[in-house]
Amino acid sequence: MNNRPGTLQIYFQLMKLRVVILLQITALCAIIAHDLMVRSESIPGDRTWLDTLESCIVTLVGGTMAAGGSNAINMVYDKDIDPGMSRTRTRPIPNGWISPRHALIFGIILAISGSAVFIPIHWKAAFWSFFSVFF
């Protein structure tokens, strides 16, 4: 068993935050590209810079939470195979830094909360965020 990191670091490891950051960069690029196309009248729509900023903030917060929750749930699902692989044996659950039950509760709360962040923007965004947690 390795030296136990701090609690916050364990949660970040459960979320696979480095992977989520790459996902979020892609999402932000898509938002900005879309809104630039709207402003250049390449596609129909009416978006202000404030709309773009709001979409980016909501996507960063909600997307990070939903994807991080999904990753935590996946680590619980893989708890039986992670100890046997060199790449995954240092994850928080195989090391005993956090219980599978605790990680599952964290993942579910994070995924649901992250998906709920999208509700004020559009219910379809919230639906697809929640739906994607399971894939």
List the predicted regions and their residue ranges.
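Histidine-/acidic- and/or cysteine-rich, low-complexity loops and terminal segments associated
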Residues: 1-8, 27, 40-49
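Membrane-embedded alpha-helical segments that form the functional core of polytopic membrane enzymes
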Residues: 33, 37-79, 126-135
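Interhelical loop and helix-boundary elements at the membrane-water interface
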Residues: 6-19, 92-103
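Cytosolic, membrane-interface loops and tails of multi-pass inner-membrane proteins
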Residues: 1-6, 77-98
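The first (N-terminal) embedded transmembrane alpha-helix
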Residues: 16-34
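Alpha-helical membrane-protein architecture signal
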Residues: 4-8, 12, 57, 109
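Multi-pass membrane catalytic core of lipid/isoprenoid biosynthesis enzymes
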Residues: 87-128
